[in-house]
């Protein structure tokens, strides 16, 4: 972080602070209206169990939910002496509310500062926060094997990213991030520090669109393993590998100005090999997300987008009952509206 700040200050040295502050701020207000058909990511077996024991659903009566999300973002561009060099500061905050699930109400946001020195040349630092994200009700084995308790976690992530061109309209992007994922008091045995690295190659085709291929590798260290209560005697560390393939077509189709799809496949392998923990021992899963989207500018400053996501997780385990318990299907669909504004006090 200190190194990044030194770089930014060095390029601002030749400008007065009044010149530095003269650029306008672009604000965007967003509203999302969506539907989730399996909020708690329940397997078929768990849905059958929930019909007899609704405490699994955390007090609600449905598997699905309508949700709304409000967002506010701001972008400030600072042009430096060299026309190809600039600094961008971007911040965004989201407030989400699942109507049928009172526990799934949370806020998230992030701040990015980036230095650009030409086409596809960028150095960026990001700080992200996800606050009190509700997963579902689980058993707290340190207290009771019969009662369920609300389980939520909070993410704090820092990421350093750099991109550079390879040749005309072809560029590479790499990043490294550090995420602290800490759970509420009843489930601290799952607290983890996660290191993730990514490498993405992107190609933009003239009068067509953009396609990318990204590889992601992460290691989650269960920092509370062996510390504290009995439940921490089991190691919940894991490794995961992802492949991500997004494609966008910007020449218009089906009434949209741009359409696209993305395919993301995640492979996760738990570290634990302990017969006393059949739920995690030797367990791995393959999760696939397939998105289809389209967007259209209704007015110069008003944009609407539509997205549908199909999600599937297949779990592999030494135990058939674990495979069935931890596999699920899910469908998301949402419509977003964004209204852009320009604030220029000068």
What is the meaning of each model-derived region?
Residues 27, 31-33, 68-78, 111-117, ...:
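Residues on the lipid-exposed face of transmembrane beta-strands in outer-membrane beta-barrel proteins
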Residues 79-87, 118-125, 166-174, 206-213, ...:
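Repeated loop/turn-to-beta-strand initiation elements of outer-membrane beta-barrel proteins
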Residues 31-37, 76-78, 93-99, 127-135, ...:
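Transmembrane beta-strands of outer-membrane beta-barrel pores
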Residues 161-181, 192-273:
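Detector for outer-membrane/organellar transmembrane beta-barrel domains
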Residues 15-88:
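Outer-membrane beta-barrel initiation region
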Residues 327-346:
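Outer-membrane beta-barrel "beta-signal"
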Residues 39-46, 99-108, 126-128, 134-144, ...:
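Outer-membrane beta-barrel translocator domains and adjoining extracellular loop/strand segments
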């Amino acid at each position: 972080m200190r190194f990044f700040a030194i770089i930014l200050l060095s390029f601002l040295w030749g400008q007065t602070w009044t010149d530095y502050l003269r650029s306008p701020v672009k604000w965007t207000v967003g509203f999302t209206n969506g539907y989730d058909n399996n909020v708690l990511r329940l397997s078929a077996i768990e849905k059958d169990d929930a019909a007899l024991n609704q405490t699994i659903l955390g007090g609600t009566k449905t598997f699905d939910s309508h949700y709304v999300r409000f967002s506010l973002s701001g972008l400030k561009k600072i042009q430096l002496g060299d026309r190809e060099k600039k600094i961008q500061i971007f911040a965004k905050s989201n407030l989400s509310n699942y109507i049928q699930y009172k526990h799934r109400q949370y806020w998230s946001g992030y701040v990015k500062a980036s230095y650009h020195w030409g086409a596809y040349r960028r150095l960026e630092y990001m700080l992200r926060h996800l606050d009190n994200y509700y997963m579902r009700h689980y058993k707290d084995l340190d207290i009771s094997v019969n009662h369920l308790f609300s389980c939520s976690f909070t993410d704090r992530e820092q990421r350093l990213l750099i991109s550079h061109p390879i040749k005309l309209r072809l560029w590479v992007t790499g990043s490294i991030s550090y995420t602290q994922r800490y759970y509420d008091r009843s489930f601290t045995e799952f607290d983890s520090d996660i290191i993730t690295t990514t490498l993405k190659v992107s190609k933009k085709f003239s009068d067509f669109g953009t396609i990318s291929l990204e590889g992601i590798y992460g290691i989650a260290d269960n920092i509370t393993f062996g510390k504290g209560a009995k439940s921490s005697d089991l190691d919940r560390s894991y490794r995961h590998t992802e492949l991500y393939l997004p494609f966008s077509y910007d020449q218009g189709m089906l009434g949209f100005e741009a359409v696209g799809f993305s395919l993301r496949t995640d492979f996760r392998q738990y570290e634990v090999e302990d017969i006393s923990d059949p739920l995690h021992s030797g367990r791995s899963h393959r999760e696939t997300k397939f998105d289809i989207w389209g967007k259209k500018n209704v007015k110069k400053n008003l944009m609407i987008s539509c997205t549908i996501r199909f999600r599937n997780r297949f779990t592999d385990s030494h135990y058939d009952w674990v495979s069935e318990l931890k596999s699920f299907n899910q469908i998301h669909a949402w419509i977003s509206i964004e209204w852009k504004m320009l604030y220029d006090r000068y």
